[in-house]
Each structure stands twice: as C-alpha cells, then as structure tokens.
Swiss-Prot record:
Keyword presence, Transmembrane helix: yes
Name under which the protein is recorded: Polyprenyl-phosphate transporter
Record's bilayer topology term: Multi-pass membrane protein
Pfam families per UniProt: VCA0040-like (PF04018)
Listed GO biological process terms: cell wall organization
Entry-linked InterPro entries: VCA0040-like (IPR007163)
Activity regulation annotation text: Active in alkaline conditions.
PANTHER family given in the database record: INTEGRAL MEMBRANE PROTEIN, POLYPRENYL-PHOSPHATE TRANSPORTER
Family membership: Belongs to the PopT family.
Length: 308
C-alpha cells in the first residue's frame, strides 16, 4: 500500500513539473514527461480512450474501463499539471519579467541535457537519422521565428487554440505556451487562469481534450511503428527551440498584446559580453551558468530516479 502511495505521489510531482514547464513559452511539458520516464505510459493511457471502451464497459463495467485507461495514473498526473498551472502561473510569469536571464538559463540547460537524454534512446544511429534530426530542428526553429498572429479571444478561437496547444504540449520540444503566443492567445488564456474565468477555461479545456484524444493516437502509432525515426525528429524539435530560449537577447521591435502590454516582437541573440555592452546591464553569466548546470543535474537525477 505504501509503495502504491509513493508511486502516485511521484506521478503527481511529475505532473507538477510538467505543468510548470507548460507555463513557460519555449518549454514543453512533454519534455518533462520523457525525461521522467512516463511518456510512453501517458500516450498509451490516453490512446486507450476511444470507442472500443464500450466493449470493455459491457464486459467489465465502469471499474474495468477505469483500469483499462490507467485512470488513477491519468487523474494523478493531470491533477499535478492543473495544480501547477493554477498555482505557478503568476509566479513564473513574474519571474520571467523580473529575473529573465536566470530563469531562461535554467530552462536552456534543461532542454540541452534533454536532447542528450533523448539521443541516448535511439537504438540505430544511422545517417538517415541525422537527416530527421536536422528536419526536426529546422521545423522547430521555423516556428519560433514566425510572426505572431492577433486572434480575438472568441469562444471558437479559444476552443481551437486549446486543441492546437495541447498537441504541442505532449510533443517534447514544442511548447504549447509558445504556440499560444504565436496565435495571440497566450495572454487571454493565462489571464483566464489568473482570474479564474470559468467560461474561457472550460472551453479551452474542451479544446485540449479534443486535441489530446486525437493526436495521442497518431503519436503513439508513430512511436510503435517508427520509434527511432520519431524520437530523432522529436529531438530535432528540441534542438530547434534552443535559440528561442537563449537567455541573452536584444529586442529589435515591440508589439502590443491583447492585454495592452508592450512585449518583444523581434529579438536577436547576444553573447553575455555583447549584452552588457549594448544594454549596460549585468549579464549575470555566472548565475546563469550555475542554473544551467543545476538543470543538467536535475535531469540526470530524474533519469536515475526513473530507472529505479
């Protein structure tokens, strides 16, 4: 009994970590799921939510359905994710504004070591795999340099954005939050979380459920049939997002978001020393390095924990 309790506590904590990552534009909760060893279990559990459940229900009842979809695992994990988003949204948003370099440095280190972690999962290292890695990196980088849209937060747009964002959230390397930024829905959705706008939240979650149930089947099938190729492409996605979360940037132009706030539109990456010269602000390179290494240590620790 104690062992089961610890397992569910562990799953809940992994959900908290996934939720925290999903709040940050440029970081994916799917990455956290992968490095903590629950990615395949998550996809398979979601994939089992389909019309075939009717047969399970007729044969085994509701209890059988709950067991078939690994219900306790899903409830515990998503409980952690939603708890994290609800409680950490304000804190992470504040930290990204007030302490951007240390926070982005931590996530840069997290993604960098996660790339190494995922490359280790690839069994057959061929030249063709390298091509898929490059393709994934180009695709992800292309997304990061797209000009953001300015969609109005209508109910239908909120529904569609939920479906799109959740697909990104379960992909290691593609950030659901960043996709929301690209389509101009990040501020409205985060604002709804902060102020608990029930109508917006319910519509967004409905979109998430629709997207999750449909996309998980595709991704699960790809991982079963073409695991190495899929993992290589997903690793490329993570590589392609690294320039986006590089800590030192110069803002070239600004835009006004749907909340009336000035936010960066075009940015270019700088070295820490260029940053100090151009902005006359400290680069905090030593603190940044420490936090990058802390992220590396965290992932290696999670990897060891997942192997137990």
């Amino acid at each position: 009994m104690a062992g089961k309790t610890m397992n569910y506590l562990s799953t809940y904590l992994k959900g908290l970590a996934m939720g925290a990552a999903d709040v940050v534009p440029g970081v994916s909760g799917g990455t956290i799921a992968f490095i903590t060893g629950i990615y395949d279990t998550l996809l398979e559990s979601i994939r089992r939510i389909n019309p075939s459940l009717l047969k399970v229900w007729k044969a085994q009842g509701l209890a059988g359905v709950f067991r078939h979809i690994n219900g306790l695992f899903l409830i515990t994990l998503f409980g952690g994710i939603f708890t994290s988003i609800a409680t950490l949204a304000k804190l992470i948003s504040w930290l990204l504004v007030t302490h951007p370099i240390p926070i982005w440095s931590f996530f840069f280190g997290l993604i960098l070591v996660s790339v190494w972690h995922m490359l280790r999962q690839i069994e057959q290292k061929k030249l063709s795999r390298l091509l898929w890695l490059i393709a994934g990196a180009i695709f992800a980088y292309g997304i990061t340099v797209l000009k953001p849209l300015h969609l109005e937060p209508t109910y239908i747009n909120v529904l569609i954005s939920g479906a799109i964002a959740i697909c990104a959230m379960i992909l290691p390397g593609i950030s659901g939050s960043f996709i929301l930024l690209l389509i101009g829905m990040y501020a409205p959705v985060l604002g709804a979380v902060k102020t608990f706008q029930l109508d917006i939240l319910l519509i967004f979650l409905t979109g998430c459920v629709i997207g999750l149930l449909s996309f998980s089947h595709i991704l699960s099938w790809l991982l079963r049939r073409y695991r190495d190729v899929t993992l290589t492409f997903l690793t490329g996605l993570m590589l392609g997002t690294l320039p986006k979360i590089w800590p030192w940037k110069e803002t070239l132009s600004w835009r006004v978001n749907s909340s009336g706030e000035q936010v960066p539109l075009l940015q270019r990456n700088l070295s820490p020393f260029e940053f100090e010269t151009l902005t006359s602000q400290p680069s905090q390179w030593l603190l940044a390095l420490v936090l990058m290494l802390a992220a590396v240590a965290l992932v290696l620790g999670l990897e060891k924990y997942a192997e137990k």
